[in-house]
Amino acid sequence: MVDPVAALCNFNVLEVIFSYLDLNDLSRCSQVCRSWHHFLNDENSDVWRWHCLHKLPKEAMKSDLLTSVSTYKTKLRAYFHAWSPNDCSRNVYIKPNGFTLHRNPVAQSTDAARAKIGFRHGRHAWEVIWEGPLGTVAVIGISTKDAALQCHGYVALLGSDDQSWGWNLVENHLLHNGDMQGSYPLLSNAPKYQVGERIRVILDCDDNTLSFEKNYEFLGVAFRGLPDKKLYPTVSAVYGNTEVSMVYLGTPLDG
């Protein structure tokens, strides 16, 4: 019979040790044995709380931005999937919260940003929240690493080439390879996007499709036949001082 005091002691020791390991090591530890896997599977444990509080910016933890990711582990995961400060237009910077981009007021420029991590396998979902004016063009979607992140003028940059796919929220049009692929969503008098609404983007790399949800309503498949390439969450914007946040959610829930 296991001594409960000894078991608690082992639990506390593991907690301390795991708090000092990096995330890659924690992933490997979860595969060592059933006990460690069970221990680390608690997404609100003190281990994940410690890593979350030490790695996430305080601005993010204090805001309402992460309400869709309820556990410490999912908040931490969302942070590592957020906008990349090294993969965006020179006219864009990532705010201290780590999740929100800010487009500087530069005339005659369209500017884009990509997430830190792209996907080639599996199913993935993330939320995009446009927190400032849309301007004449505001596009959300995906791109490969080869898609441009800045161009002259006010245009739909995301979707302007064969390396990107986007939904222009201003005109409710789908864009790819420089062409309008049709209206979206396929509804009569589809409502326009309202600033602050959360749009859920769903990338299915197994089925090669991109879809969107708004207000928990599935809007339909937007793009089919996506290539077998690593695809990144991306947005492009034209309005000066507008801001766009992105929160990675993980595997989408069906139904």
Swiss-Prot record:
Domain (F-box): residue spans on this chain: 3-51
Subunit structure as annotated in this protein's UniProt entry: Component of an E3 ubiquitin ligase complex composed of hiw and Fsn.
The upper taxonomy is: Eukaryota, Metazoa, Ecdysozoa, Arthropoda, Hexapoda
Q: Which SUPFAM superfamilies match?
A: Concanavalin A-like lectins/glucanases (SSF49899), F-box domain (SSF81383)
Database matches in SMART domains: SPRY
Q: Identify the domain of life.
A: Eukaryota
Q: Member of which family?
A: Belongs to the FBXO45/Fsn family.
Report the protein's function: Required in the presynaptic motoneuron to down-regulate the levels of wnd and restrain synaptic terminal growth at the neuromuscular junction (NMJ).
Per its record, how is this protein called by name? F-box/SPRY domain-containing protein 1
Matching InterPro entries: B30.2/SPRY, B30.2/SPRY_sf, ConA-like_dom_sf, F-box-like_dom_sf, F-box_dom, FBXO45-Fsn/SPSB_families, SPRY_dom, SPRY_FBXO45
Sequence ranges assigned to domain B30.2/SPRY in this UniProt record:
61-253
What are its GO cellular component terms? Answer: neuromuscular junction; SCF ubiquitin ligase complex
Q: Which UniProt keywords are given for this protein, alphabetically ordered? A: Neurogenesis, Synapse, Ubl conjugation pathway
Q: Where in the cell is it found?
A: Synapse
What is any one GO biological process for this UniProt entry? protein ubiquitination
Name which cysteines form disulfide bonds: none
Pathway per the UniProt entry: Protein modification; protein ubiquitination
Which CDD domains does this UniProt record tie to the protein? F-box_FBXO45, SPRY_Fbox
